[in-house]
Amino acid sequence: MSSSAMEALHALIPEQHQLDVEAAAAVSSATSGEESGHVLQGWAKRKRSRRQRSEEENLALCLLMLSRGGKQRVQAPQPESFAAPVPAEFKCSVCGKSFSSYQALGGHKTSHRVKQPSPPSDAAAAPLVALPAVAAILPSAEPATSSTAASSDGATNRVHRCSICQKEFPTGQALGGHKRKHYDGGVGAAASSTELLAAAAAESEVGSTGNGSSAARAFDLNIPAVPEFVWRPCAKGKMMWEDDEEVQSPLAFKKPRLLTA
């Protein structure tokens, strides 16, 4: 290598160092390869006005850019893989079946709560027993019917008789209305004395059957009692009631006169 080439190389080293610093700053600020290329091209165009680059300088600059550009290569972010959500399973605790929702599980559980039809029992499978005829049962009920009819006939055939005139009436209300005439005197005026005596005797017999009757006591309770009193003499010649105060004589008491000769 000639001395002129050596001098040119030594003069190129400081300039190359400055170029490396500026290129590194430009590459670090760029976000992509194209933007860094545009910046370097603009920077190279500005520097061409000062001095023409040689082929060796261009080659060295290209190698430097390639070496630095490989280190700053940015890897594209890989798309995240979204896993499909696993559907939740709702399992029946009775039969073990799985369902996609809780509502479906609830509807299935209602089928377990419904009572299953019970199998037919032996009593239901047994043949039916033949029932006796209705005509065989009816005769047994006839005596009761006849007895009730007899009692009703006896009640209807009862005779209501007046104890005063011995008349008969079909009902008790008619007999009561008839007896009211006896008490008012309408029938008693026309009745004979014998009938009245018989009625009085019948009433006395009815009254004697009761406790404490007027016939046994020989007095009538409707008549006021006669007051009982006893006279007793007093020492002074006055009459007094037994339980009352002294009764004064209506006449004035006269003193005895003394006769003088």
Swiss-Prot record:
The keyword Transport does not apply. One of its GO terms (biological process) is regulation of DNA-templated transcription. Its main location: nucleus. It is found in: Nucleus. Disulfide bonds: none annotated. Highest levels in the root apex of wheat seedlings, lowest levels in leaf proximal region. A zinc finger (C2H2-type) spans 90-112, 160-182. Residues 26-51 are annotated as: Disordered. GO terms for cellular component: nucleus. One of its GO terms (molecular function) is transcription cis-regulatory region binding. Coiled coil: none annotated. Keywords: DNA-binding, Metal-binding, Nucleus, Repeat, Transcription, Transcription regulation, Zinc, Zinc-finger. InterPro entries: AZF1/2/3-like (IPR044653), Znf_C2H2_sf (IPR036236), Znf_C2H2_type (IPR013087). Potential transcription factor which binds the nonamer motif 5'-CATCCAACG-3'. Possibly involved in regulating transcription of the histone H3 and H4 genes. This is Zinc finger protein 1. It comes from Triticum aestivum. The lineage of its organism: Eukaryota, Viridiplantae, Streptophyta, Embryophyta, Tracheophyta.
